[in-house]
Structures are given as C-alpha cells and as structure tokens.
Amino acid sequence: MIALVDCNNFYASCERVFRPHLENKPVAVLSNNDGCVIARSNESKALGLKMGEPIFKKRELVRRHNIHLFSSNFALYGDISKRVFDIVSKNIPAYEIYSIDEAFLDFRGIKDPYAFAVHLRRKVKQWTGIPISIGISYTKTLSKVAGYLAKKSPEGVCYLQDKKHISDILGRLPVDEIWGVGMRYAIKLKKYGIHTAKNLLECDETWIRKMMNVVGLRMVRELKCIPHFSLEEGRSMKKSICTSRSFSVEISDYTRMSEYISMFASRCSEKLRGEAACARSISVFMYTNRFKPKARQYSGYFSMDFHTAASDTITITKLAIECLKKIYRSGYSYKKAGVTLSGIIPRNQVQLSLFDSADRKKADTLMQTLDKINGNMGRDILKLSSSGINNKWKIGKERLSPCYTTRWSDILSVRV
C-alpha cells in the first residue's frame, strides 16, 4: 500500500501555527512583491478568493471580510516542511518527498493502515501544528484519489482498499481531479465525452496512449490498481529551478534589468548547489504589464545549453546575460522577468564535454567558499559585481511574518 501525506493549505497553515487566534478565520498568502494569491485557508476559498488572483483586484473583498494577508515566507515554510516530513518518515520502510507539502509513504508491513494514519495525523498536528490529510491505496495515483477524498473527510484519512468501492469512487471523480490530468488534457477528454475517471478507464488503451502518451497510459493503469510509478526514495530531484519576480516599479533600463537577471541566476545557482545537482540548460524570460493594455506590450524568451552541466554562479550568470541580450528590447517597461535552470541531474552524473575548457575543480572550490561565507555571514556578503554593487534587490514584502524557527532574533519569547 502507498500513502500520500498532504499538508492542508500548507502556507496558510504555517502562518497560523504561531497565530492561533487566526484559527477558523480567512487567511491568504501572497506571491513575491505581494502581487497574487498563492495559498488560501478554507475560509478564504469559501469567500471566493481564487488562486493566482492579483490581490489589488480583491481589496474590497479583503476589507469587507477582514481576510488576513501575509507575504510569502519560504524560509519558514521550508523549515516547517522538513519538521513535518521528519515525523512522518519515522518507522516507514521507504518514502518520497514529492513537494514542499506532499510525500508518498510505503505502508507495506503496517497491519492496520487506517489506524496508523489516524495516529500519524494526530502526532503531526500535536508536534508541529500543521493539519495533514492522508490517502491510502494500492498505487500512487489511487493514493492521490484517496488524498482528494481525505481532505473532505472529518477524520482527514481515506483508505481505498475495496475494489468495488474504488470503482464507485472513480465513477464520481471528475477527470480533471486525476493526478497528471491537467487543464489541457481535461478539455480534450471532455470533448470526447470523458467526464469522470471511470469514463477514462473504459477507453481503449491504444487510444489513451495516443491521446496522453505513455505516462498517461501508466496513470490509467494505476487507477486499475496496477502499480507503475515506484517510490523515488528520499527527496525527489527537481526537474527545474526558477527565480523570478514581478517588479513593484517597472524596469525600462538595460543595466538595471541585467543586474536583476544576474541576481536571479545567482539565486538559481544557490538552490542548485543546495540540491547537489547541476543544470544542462538555462532560459531567461521577461514581459511587460499585461494589465496595462494601453501600454506597449512585449514578451521575450530565450534558452541556451551549457557545454557541460553546471552549478557554479559565474558560468550560469554568464549564460543568463547572453540570453538577456537576445531578448531585451529598448522602449518597453518590463513588469516581470526570471531565470529558469532545467535538465537537472545529480552532480555525480555530470559528463564532461570535449569543448569545456573550464577548471571545474577550481570553480567548485570557489563556490564552496562563497556558500560557506554567505551562509555564516548573511546572504550576498559575497556576490558578483554584475548583480550591482549598491543594488539591495529587496522584494516588496510588507506583510512578512517573522522567521520563527530559522532566525535567532525572531524566536518567540515565553513568559513564565
């Protein structure tokens, strides 16, 4: 049996941990620069606040219902995530951390999976303050279905074992709620009269493969209780790493934009080294403010490959600037830009290229020194000059909560 652990409304729940008075009150977390909604409590969802919605469009709703807004605090969320999964992975033969708020657990050998899940859920809530849902079934895809139902259950746990019951559930499950069926596939399937998971199971497998490729076919077989996706033990390797920002003040100067792109590339490099990984390609994108239809509109994107998969800041930043030069156009005011690293592989799997003249050992030593100094003394104590000497590069976060668990100055004091 496979279990899916899913932290409920994770970012919003993290903000509530240290503010218990917000329990049962509407809470929402905003993206960088406090631009869009990226997490909502159930109360905020009930009020009609939607994911990805620009918050300036909902000022009246926020005021009328006193929705509590928070700037995203990823240092806090990442630390609480680690605490949650340290607890759930104990006494489990294998587990896979799928995302910051989800993990798959191997429940083989557990005599009473439902009772174990109920106990685990209570333990996580008691030890961290984070509510979780647990879905249990034969495969990863079915555990996702069980997790979807667990969120609607008062107990927060759903165990799908009886195959007739599973068939009944799939007959009511909307096709767009299946793991791996995004909006594009859902629209396409509905055109063929496929509205539920059971409708999809009744289709010919050759047709499914043609419509949804081999991954889609495996997903459908998993709905039939046939395992196809094994656990990738520990923490899954990210497929891509992106750093991007919506600018509070639009950028219309190349030098300023190149400083931001340089800093984005540096951030991506740090994250990459934190994963003990290297990237094979890089892309840069930028675009104007689409919410100003009367302004001149432009969007640019360019991608390049490294000769050899890289993780050092200097190599990555150089190529990021090359990409920027390909797409930058004068005369526009840019609202958002970003850098994405893709083709990510473990550092120990990198194959050297004949065309690579860089001294890899020297670069690795330099990056280790840079990371150590910045880790001990504070971020950007050492940085590339291309990111701006006097550029403080501060993200607009007017509603940022303290880093209660990762910064000594923010630790709560208790009076006894």
Enumerate the language-model features and the residues they cover:
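C-terminal hydrophobic structural anchor segments
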Residues: I321-N376
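Gly/Gly-Pro- and Ser/Thr-rich, intrinsically disordered tail segments characteristic of DNA damage-repair
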Residues: M1-R221, C225-P227, E270, R360-V416
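Short, hydrophobic beta-strand segments
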Residues: A103-R108, Y301-H307, V350-D356
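Short, charged/polar, Gly/Pro-enriched secondary-structure boundary elements
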Residues: K111-A115, P293, I345-L352
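Short Gly/Ser/Thr- and Asp/Glu-enriched loop/turn motifs at secondary-structure junctions
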Residues: Y98-E102, S137-K140, A277-S281, Y332-K336
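DNA-contacting surface of Y-family translesion DNA polymerases
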Residues: E177, I187-S333, Q349, R415
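Short loop/turn motifs enriched for small/polar and acidic residues
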Residues: S137-T139, Y287, T340-I344, S387
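Short, charged/polar surface micro-motifs in flexible loops or helix N-caps
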Residues: F10, N33-C36, N289-K292, I344-N348
